[in-house]
Amino acid sequence: MALNPLEQFKVYTIIELPKLFGYDINFTNSSLFMMISVILMVLFLLLGIRKGAVIPGYLQAAVEYVYDFVVSIIESNTGSKGLEHIPLIFTVFIFILSCNLVGVLPYSFTVTSHVIVTFALSMVVFTYITIVGFKERGVEFLRILLPKGTPSWLAPIIIIIKLFAYLVRPISLSIRLAANMIAGHTIIKVIAGFVINMNIFFTPAPFLFIIALIGFEVFVAVLQAYIFTILTCVYLSDAVK
């Protein structure tokens, strides 16, 4: 990996399975680390809420903080109407966060570095919001394509532009998340490879610099989960307001 920083993003088969309708459904390293991320996510939540103490311990306090954090994002962008959608938004946030943080660990695989994964997440969010929009507002949901006060002669152009902008939302969401995770991990690998090749790994400055980069990557992992969630809430506000 030190020689090729992009090698860490390669998907390889762990268990080969029979094809399903002509499609490969092999169990890959991506599948493995996605399962690990989900298991860690579920354990974190279950262990945090199993006692439900009035005076919470550290783990329960952490779970409550994450939950309250997501609720505050929803309320600030959608108001009280968006609170009924907490299950989806909280699940998306904690899943992305878990995948991102697992990807920082040595010899792991960053699931969210692949557009196919982030695009699948984005399409779930996009489809859900579109369904909610028509369910809550009916045909009036289409008003998001034409801002109030738009001159009639300009309306056709604006509608086309707004429709295009709406349809590319899942693409922009998925590429933003994947690109940032790829960039961060690649930089760490490049610098770490340089330090190892120069045989200066155990000298203080380069070692501390790599530690700082890893700390920064943890920050980016949390930040990207936050950005994905807040954009989801912004898009949801169009459907419920």
From Swiss-Prot:
GO molecular-function terms, A-Z: proton-transporting ATP synthase activity, rotational mechanism
Keyword Transport: yes
Alphabetized InterPro entries for the sequence: ATP_synth_F0_asu (IPR000568), ATP_synth_F0_asu_AS (IPR023011), ATP_synth_F0_asu_bact/mt (IPR045083), F0_ATP_A_sf (IPR035908)
Keyword set, alphabetical order: ATP synthesis, Cell membrane, CF(0), Hydrogen ion transport, Ion transport, Membrane, Transmembrane, Transmembrane helix, Transport
Protein location: Cell membrane
Record carries keyword Transmembrane helix: yes
Membership in a protein family: Belongs to the ATPase A chain family.
Subunit structure: F-type ATPases have 2 components, CF(1) - the catalytic core - and CF(0) - the membrane proton channel. CF(1) has five subunits: alpha(3), beta(3), gamma(1), delta(1), epsilon(1). CF(0) has three main subunits: a(1), b(2) and c(9-12). The alpha and beta chains form an alternating ring which encloses part of the gamma chain. CF(1) is attached to CF(0) by a central stalk formed by the gamma and epsilon chains, while a peripheral stalk is formed by the delta and b chains.
The name this protein goes by in its record: ATP synthase subunit a
